[in-house]
């Protein structure tokens, strides 16, 4: 080079930023590059060899991955506005930076269900959520990426995402639900008032079927000696219950004066059934009761002249009209 003033320009690599300039007093070991990649006004005199024009770079680590862990109370796989976050879920981030450095870090979801990994380098990562207690993963990919659950129910892991050094990922979420139960009591409504009176007995052996929103039978149960029945370990969702009413019983009167003691069944399309029951995550509804009362009976027959005295209606023996018949208690 001829003696003169020079500028040196460095190309800043992807994923890096310029290091702090001229730190310390030793010009041989510091960085001279400015934020735009230039070292300016280098003066060379005749015969000079300058070996201290240096450029230092540091990896940009300003990326973020995180979002939300929530309880999917209705089991639809969507973050509805009323559904709460879950605290204490273990979340693990694994992956590799663009330089090939492996990453494996963990955190715990906060009280509002949020979690996050900040100051990440550019790279490819995935997130794994670990279930605790009775939580189960909800169905993934049920709606847009901002509102769905991204965790594979079998592994707890999300898909891999590749991010730049400044990218902010706020859409890797995990939804959980817990199992629930519904049921209660079948009784003989002796006074037919539609309410469970303390002296009225239970009815054993009544078959009840749990029907899901698709119209399929999920499970069945028979009322026990105490009239109790229960459907347990249920997924959140909408259900109805159908009852097989014996011919010697009918549904009792509908009475809504006390919802804790009334009967919840009515005739729906010819079947004894409840209205739709919304079952939410981690709920117990022991208030679905069935009241039955004795069916009305009838007595009928023939009055005839048994001319031959054989006790059998024989052809030719006349019927008797206008005879008064009494029904007596015994």
Task: List the predicted regions and their residue ranges.
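Acidic Ser/Thr-enriched surface turn/capping motif at secondary-structure junctions
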Residues: 1-69, 73-112, 116-226, 231-329
């Amino acid at each position: 080079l001829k003696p003169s003033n020079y500028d040196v320009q460095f190309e800043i690599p992807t994923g890096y930023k310029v290091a702090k300039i001229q730190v310390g007093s030793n010009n041989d070991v510091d960085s001279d590059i400015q934020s735009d990649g230039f070292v300016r006004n280098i003066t060379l005199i005749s015969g000079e060899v300058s070996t201290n024009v240096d450029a230092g770079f540091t990896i940009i680590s300003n990326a973020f991955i995180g979002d939300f862990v929530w309880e999917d109370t209705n089991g639809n796989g969507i973050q509805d506005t009323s559904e709460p976050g879950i605290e204490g879920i273990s979340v693990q981030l694994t992956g590799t930076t663009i330089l090939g450095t492996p990453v494996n870090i963990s955190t715990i979801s906060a009280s509002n269900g949020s979690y996050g990994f900040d100051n990440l380098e550019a790279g490819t990562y995935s997130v794994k959520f670990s279930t605790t207690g009775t939580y189960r993963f909800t169905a993934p990919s049920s709606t847009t990426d901002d509102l769905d659950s991204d965790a594979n129910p079998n592994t707890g892991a999300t898909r891999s995402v590749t991010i730049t050094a400044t990218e902010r990922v706020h859409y890797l979420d995990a939804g959980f639900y817990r199992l629930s139960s519904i049921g209660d009591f079948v009784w003989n409504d002796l006074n037919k008032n539609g309410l469970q009176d303390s002296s009225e007995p239970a009815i054993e052996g009544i078959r009840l079927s749990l029907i899901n929103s698709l119209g399929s039978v999920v499970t069945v149960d028979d009322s026990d000696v105490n009239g109790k029945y229960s459907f347990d370990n249920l997924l959140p969702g909408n259900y109805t219950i159908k009852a097989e009413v014996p011919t010697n019983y009918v549904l009792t009167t509908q009475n809504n004066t006390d919802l804790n003691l009334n009967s919840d069944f009515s005739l729906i399309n010819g079947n004894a059934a409840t209205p739709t029951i919304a079952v939410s995550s981690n709920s117990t509804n022991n208030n679905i009761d069935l009241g039955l009362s004795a069916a009305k009976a009838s007595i009928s027959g023939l009055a005839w002249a048994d001319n031959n005295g054989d006790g059998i209606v024989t052809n030719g023996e006349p019927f008797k009209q206008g005879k008064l018949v009494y029904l007596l208690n015994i």
